[in-house]
Amino acid sequence: MSFFGFNTTLPKENMFPNEGQLEEDGIDFEETYDDLGNQLNEAGDELNDETFGVSAGSIGRDFDFSGTTAQASAQLEDEQYQINQQNIFAKPVKPASSELPQVSRLNGASQFPSREPASTAINKLSDLQPMASIWENIVPEKPAIIPPEVASLQDRLGAQPSEKVFSLQELEEQLLNSMTAPKPPSQPAIPIVPSEMAAQVTRENISSLDPAISAASIGNVTFGQPNIPSTTTDFAGLAAPNMVHPSQAIPNPVMQPSLVPQMPYPQNGMYNPSVAPPASLVNLFQQEQLIQNQNLDEKRQKLERDHMLMAQCAGLMTRSDKSFIARIQISQLMSEDPESDDFYYRVYSIIRGRKPSEEEASHFIQTYLGPSNNRRRGRRSENPMQKLQQQLQRLVSSAKERPKATQLSLEGALGKIAVNTVRTPRQLLNVKRPTEPASSNSSLNNFSGFSTKKDVLHAIEKVYDLLLDFEQALRKASTLETTDQEQIDTWKTTLSEKLESIWKALYINESLEASSKTRPPFISIISHPKGMRLLPRLFPHLSKEQQISILKVVVYNFDSLDIVLRGTFDVNGELPLDVVSEMSSFTQFIIPPLLTIVNELDLETINNLFSQLLNRTNAVYLIQTKIGLSFLTLFISRAEILKQSGTVNQNEKEEWENTFNVMFNRVKGHFSTVFPPPNARAYADESYPWEFLAACATAASSEQHFTLVSETRDRVLDNIITSKRAPSEIAVVRISNVNLFLNAMGLDARQLSA
C-alpha cells in the first residue's frame, strides 16, 4: 500500500546495471510541489479512521513478519536477476568526459541538469525519511562506522582541501581543468571496462574486507555523498578494496609497489579517470599500517620483558611476610625502648633465662606473632604464633643441650662461622685470644724484618704514638713539686719505661743482629721520610750508648738504604724524583744527629766504624753517591781533627793511616767519578765532591796528593775557565769549591789562572 503514490514494487537498484539511464523523464520536485502541506489541519485526530481506512481496534495479533519478508525478498532477487540479464549489453559505455558532475548551490538549487544515475535517484525516493516537522519523534539515523585506518587516510587526504572554501565558479573551473588536462606519461593507462563488471568487481573486493570497512566503503561510493565531486570521498571509496587489513599484513617489512593490485575504475558519472588515486597513496597507507604494526610489536615485546623481569621476583615474599616486616618496623618506631622490642634481644633474653614480664610478653606476641591478614581460601593456614613459639622452644632447648666450647677445642682455629639460616641469621665468630705474654715476647725477640710497606707504616705510627705519650709525660715535670721526691722518682720511672717502649718499637737490637741477606727493621723505618723525622725528636732523650747503637746500625747496613742503592746518576745525568726527595730528607733529618754523635767519638771508635763501612760496602760505588761521600767525609774529617789535636797515641794514628790507605787504594783511579756527570746541570755546582777531596787531601801523603791532582785536573781547570765566563754568583761558587780542595794541599786557584 502506498500513501504518497510511489511504486513500491520496483526494486531499489533496478537501474544500477544500466548505468542509471532511466527511460522516463526525471522528477522535478519544484514543479510538482503545490503547497498542499500548508493546508493540512492538524488540530484534531478524530478523522484518522477515515484517512487510513482501518480502525485501531480491528488490528489483529497474528503477525507473520518472517514469512512475508522472505516472500518479498525472494521476489525482489528474481526480478533483479532478470533485469540484469536483459540489460548487460543493452547500451554502449559512454565516456565519462562527456558528463559533468552536478554541483549543488549553496541554497540547494542545481546549476546544471541532473545527470545522476537512476539507481541513486530511486534509492533516494525509496529511502525518503519523514520530515522532522511532521514526525517529531523520529530517531536520528546513526552514522556509518568507519574504521580508524580509513578515517585517518580520509583525514590526511581531505585536510588540506577543506581549509579553503571555493566559490561556484572556482569549482566549475577546477572540474573542467581536471577532466581536460592531459594525463602524465608516467601514469599507467587505466583499462576501461563496462560499469556492470566494474560494479561487480567493486562489490566482490569490498565484500572480502571486514564488514565495517566494506560498509563504510559502499556508503562512500554509492549512497554517502550528493552530487558534489569530493576527491576525498572518491579516494576513500576506491582505495578501500585495495587496503590491507592489519591482521592480513605481509611479514616482509619492505612494501613493494608492484605487489599492489591495480583495480579498474568504473566509467560512470561519479568516477573520473583523471582523479583516480595514485599508487603512492596506497603505498603511503600500507607504510602507515606497517609502522603501526611495528609499534604494536615493540609495545608487546616491552610488556613481555617487563612481565619477565617482574616474574623473576614474584613469590619471594607473601603478603603475610610484608605485613610482618611492616609491623616490626612500625613497632620499633613507636616504642620508647626499641632494644626491648628487638627480636634477637628477646631470643637472647630467653636463652639467658630472664623471664619477661606479662606486659612485655603480650606486647611481643602482638608485635611479632599477631594474626595475619592473608586469608587463604580453601586452604588451612598455620597459626604463625604457634609456629614461632615452637621454633623458639626448639632453639632454647638446643642451646641448653649444646656443650660449651672449651679452649682446647678452639686451638689452632681462626674462627668458627655458623651457617646463615633463618633460625641463625647472625654469624658467630670465636677468635682465639693470646693468654700467654711469653709467646708474644718471644715472637718480638725473633723479629727479623717487615714483609710489606704497610707493616713499616704501622710500625712508624706506633713509634709516633709512644713518642707523643713520652713527650706528654715529659711536659708534666713543670707540675711536679720539687719537695716531693717520691713523686719525682715515680715520674722518672714512668719516663724510663716509656722510653724503653720506644726503643723496643725501633727494633735497634734486632737490626744489629740481622744478617746481611735481610733488611733490618730500623733501616726500613728510617728509609721512609716520615720515619726520618723521628730521629731529631728522639735523639736528645737517648743515652750515649743508644745513640752509638743507632749509628752502628746505619753504618753496618749502609748499603741497604734506598738512597744509596738508587743514588747514582743515570746516562742522562738525572736521579729519580723520589730518590731526590729522600736524599733531601736524609740530609736534613738523619745526618745532623749522627754528626753530633761522630763529633763526640774517639779515634778508636771512628777507626772501627770506618773499617766496617769499607768492609760492608763497595767503596768505588760508594763514592758515586752523595750520601756515601757525606759519610766518608764525616769520618775522615773527625779522624784528622783528632789526629791533629794531639790527644791520641801513636798506635791509633798508625791504625787510622792504614785504614785510610786501604780506602785510598780502593778508589784510586776513580776519583773523577765523585763529580756529577757533565749533563747533570742541576748538581754541577754542589760542594759535596770538593769536600770529600779536601778531606782526602788533608789525610793523604805527597804521593797521594799527586794522584788526586792528576785525576781531578780536568775538572779543576774546567771550573776555573768556566767561572770567567759565568755570572758573578756562579763564578764565586765555583772558585770557592776549587779552593776548598787546593787549599788542603797548599795551593790556590789564582796560581793556576795565572
From Swiss-Prot:
Repressor in keyword set: yes
Cross-referenced InterPro entries: Pat1-like, PAT1_dom
Biological process, per Gene Ontology: deadenylation-dependent decapping of nuclear-transcribed mRNA; mRNA processing; P-body assembly; regulation of translation
Single GO MF annotation: RNA binding
Annotated spans, Interaction with lsm1: 499-754
Coiled-coil parts of chain: none
Localization annotation: Cytoplasm; Nucleus; Cytoplasm, P-body
GO cellular component: cytoplasm; cytosol; nucleus; P-body
Record key words, sorted: Cytoplasm, mRNA processing, Nucleus, Repressor, RNA-binding, Translation regulation
Task performed by this protein: Activator of decapping that functions as a general and active mechanism of translational repression and required for P-body formation. Stabilizes the 3' terminus of mRNAs and modulates the rates of mRNA-decapping that occur following deadenylation. Might be required for promoting the formation or the stabilization of the preinitiation translation complexes. Necessary for accurate chromosome transmission during cell division. Together with lsm1, recruits the deadenylase ccr4 to P-bodies.
PANTHER family associated with the record: PROTEIN ASSOCIATED WITH TOPO II RELATED-1, ISOFORM A (PTHR21551:SF0), TOPOISOMERASE II-ASSOCIATED PROTEIN PAT1 (PTHR21551)
Family membership: Belongs to the PAT1 family.
Subunit structure: Interacts with dcp2. Interacts with lsm1; via C-terminus.
Protein name: Deadenylation-dependent mRNA-decapping factor pdc2
Organism (species): Schizosaccharomyces pombe (strain 972 / ATCC 24843)
